[in-house]
């Protein structure tokens, strides 16, 4: 993982966010969230999933357009996993929430959960009073063994447009461990 935390000059998401937030702030966010750079597709973004104990669980590789900041989805969706690229045959992927490693450092902050890793980075800049986590997708990491790290935390759910109904089904699971669960408006 540590070797990937460099070469940001060829990381399309870093390039885009530097134009929006400034290079210094983008560097801070990439370091805070341990976002890396992969050689895949000539330079892409690695979102490391690191658990509360600091153990790397997975690395999701995604390609972004450096001008628009959008994911590249044509002619195909450019998403892969580090363990796939390294051909780790017996790798047992056990995902966690993106940004989970930040929970231990901010034990009293409320938690806000979004779908996309990029959204967690951007929201962390604009609304730093929360620990911003990402599920990695509409269904993402909403499992009993994953949400246990949110025990006794106040949680705000911020689903993408059209995903509120799907996330509504997860409230009961979250309510069993969190002190409070609400949806953003």
Q: Where do the PLM segments sit?
A:
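TOPRIM metal-binding catalytic domain and adjacent DNA-binding surface shared by DnaG-type primases
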Residues: 1-57, 103-105, 177
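Short, well-ordered coil/turn elements that cap or connect secondary structure elements
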Residues: 2-5, 127, 150-152, 175-178
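Short, aromatic/basic amphipathic alpha-helical patches
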Residues: 17, 166-178
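Acidic, metal-coordinating catalytic cores used for nucleic-acid/nucleotide bond scission
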Residues: 118, 138-142, 159-169
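A generic structural motif
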Residues: 134-138, 180-185
């Amino acid at each position: 993982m540590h070797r990937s935390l460099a070469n940001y000059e060829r990381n399309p998401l870093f390039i885009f966010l530097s134009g929006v937030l400034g290079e210094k702030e983008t560097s801070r966010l990439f370091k805070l969230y341990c976002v890396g750079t992969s050689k895949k597709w000539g330079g892409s973004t690695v979102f490391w999933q690191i658990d509360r104990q600091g153990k790397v669980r997975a690395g999701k590789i995604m390609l972004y357009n450096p001008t628009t900041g959008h994911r590249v989805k044509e002619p195909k969706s450019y998403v892969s996993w580090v363990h796939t690229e390294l051909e780790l045959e017996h790798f047992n992927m056990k995902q966690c929430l993106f940004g989970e490693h930040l929970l231990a450092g901010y034990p009293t902050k409320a938690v806000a959960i979004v779908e996309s890793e990029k959204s967690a980075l951007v929201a962390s800049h604009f609304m730093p009073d929360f620990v911003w986590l990402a599920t990695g997708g509409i269904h993402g990491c909403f499992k009993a063994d994953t949400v246990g790290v949110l025990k006794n935390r106040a949680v705000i759910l911020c689903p993408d447009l059209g995903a509120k109904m799907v996330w509504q089904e997860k409230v009961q699971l979250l309510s069993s461990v969190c002190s409070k669960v609400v949806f953003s408006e």
